[in-house]
Amino acid sequence: MKKTIKGILIAVLALGSTMTFAQVATPTHKIDQTFTIPAPNYKVSPLTGLDRQGWIDAAEYLLEGAFTYVRNIDDPMYFPKQFEKTYPRDKGGVITAKLEGFCRTLFLAAPLLRENPDLTLNGIKVGDYYRHQLLNLLDPKSPSYVKPLGKNGGPSQTLVEFGALAISLTTAKNVLWDPLTQEQKDKLAATMLSYGNGPTIGSNWMFFNVFVISFFKQEGYKVNDWRMEDCLKKLLALYRGEGWYNDAPAYDYYSMWAFQMYGPIWAQTYGHFYPEYAAQFMKNQADLIDNYPYMFNAEGKMNMWGRSIPYRFGAVVPLALLGYQTDKDINYGWMRRIASSTLLQFVQNPNLLEDNVPTLGFYGPFEPAVQIYSCRGSVYWCAKAFLALLLPADNPFWTAKENNGPWDKEFKKNKVYNKFQPATNLLITDYPNVGGSEMRSWCHETVAKDWQKFRSSENYNKLAYHTEFPWMADGKNGEVSMNYATKNAKGQWEVLRLYTFKSFEDGIYRRDAVLETNLDIKYNLADIPLPNGVLRVDKVSVPTPTDIRLGHYTLSETFGKPVVERKSKNVPEATIISNGEYSLAMVNLTDWDKTEVLHPEGIHPVTYKCGLIQNEKHIQSEDVMVTLMLWKKGNKEFSKKELTPVKSVKIADDKKSVTITFADKTVKTVNF
């Protein structure tokens, strides 16, 4: 399958290579850099002020930015490129980039047109514009023309975008489809079905075939029924449990903004074609209730985790679509609190937009979090969140009063709450003291075989991911955060990425790891989440002496002030940094050669400079490291009690076990 995907990307980058490299228009005007809720509703949404109308306003705000590139009805949705690694490149991929811009901004437009068919932005009637652009796809004389898939054609990015287009045709059928002539409908059906009926990839991509086929089957066209049913069976076979699908091979947000969005929407819209599959999609959706919402922090904000993170708040759409469920015990007020908070997390961040368009990054532009399959218009996949507007105004998702779910009363201070999911080996940990959530997840991909360079990267290879501390990229000088780095035979600092899950018992999350370039360098890893951080109990074995490093999370700068180092009078061995909003502490319970406070530049997603605590040690053959990695919210200093949750550490003479006695007299043993 990887060879197939590689071929697709090469085709994307080469597509349109005979064209003159397209010029990108400049915006007609600048929109507000952040979104302001026009009419906050604190009665139903006391925490965010965002109700259903507020969601409509936010969608219009984002779509208005895209429409500043549209001066007349012929102008494509084609936006300024960011980062050389993305496409289009040198005359290539322009047609596909325009198609992405068209189909993905339509995820904003279609729900809005469903509400208001006469919507006008930048002096352009939105419905007229998208219908015109839809017909341009069928016109051989148009620069946006998409050829029907040839007899021997394979899956491509066009299939992805046509799958999205099929959903939008369903969403705003009265505006986008019904006004077309029969001849136009037939041409569109022929082109889209040439892809939908055709070959696919055994991942979330199969949904694109399903939606194209389903829409045109509903409209009475002859379709490849075998292809649709085959895709549905294979999609359901990727379900692992507890709300998670495996997207061949990773667990990430694709389980949510793809599988747990497409499945329920298909079930509600076209499930009558195969009722048994529809029922299974809905059952799988219900499973996420007890796990996925716990990934968001106390304020309902999302974690920076996995690939395609520029899709950002698209991650909340499955929480909204729980409105399709009939279970009265679902806390819809909490679901909307999360969805609205995550939406505002970005649209109210002044770094989100550049030239009126969302950046390729987490908040602002951040190349390490961007993949080579993206173009600038790819960011509008975030607009999937607005499919929440498919739910009518009287749906409980919209009418329930916002609340913080378990963060209000169930979660207690000075406690830690683990949600281990045995079907996937994912561990979600909630920390009431700091109000944050942490994820430990899958990564086992070599750089050598990771030709797209993302499944082996920082997007997946960290020891953990925390909502309060977005991940720092690895530095050229061996700076590393929330991971170990080992100096390999080439003298390079190589981070861990080949993890094998072992167990989760007695609050201890166990993994083994080996170094890609030397499988004889082995780590036995144990994470013990605590109320104010994590206790690491790790063993490393090396065939020849070498150096290792361990980095904590990082702190961004705040208010233009640098991250500062602090000292504790009561616990002088603690190394502490603070940015005024949070503090981090590293307390070494076994010896390291060196602990440094560093200020890396250009590798943090929030600010140019950040603060990092990093340990370093020379390993002769085998050693055990026991390390407290702590955090605290606010500007108050760590107390002695917070810095000393461990009373004693006893390492067996053979280094095969470590016994930890905590300050509260509980005892845990890690066996290697």
Where are these regions (language model features)?
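Catalytic and substrate-binding regions of extracellular carbohydrate-active enzymes
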Residues: Y373-P392, P396-T558, P562
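Bacterial Sec-dependent N-terminal signal peptides
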Residues: M1-T28
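Short linear interaction motifs
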Residues: P80-D90, Y363-F366, P406-F411, L519
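Low-complexity, Ser/Thr/Pro/Gly-enriched N-terminal "stalk/linker" regions
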Residues: V24-E100, D128-Q133
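Short alpha-helical segments and helix-capping/turn motifs at coil-helix boundaries
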Residues: P88-G93, K147-N152, I613
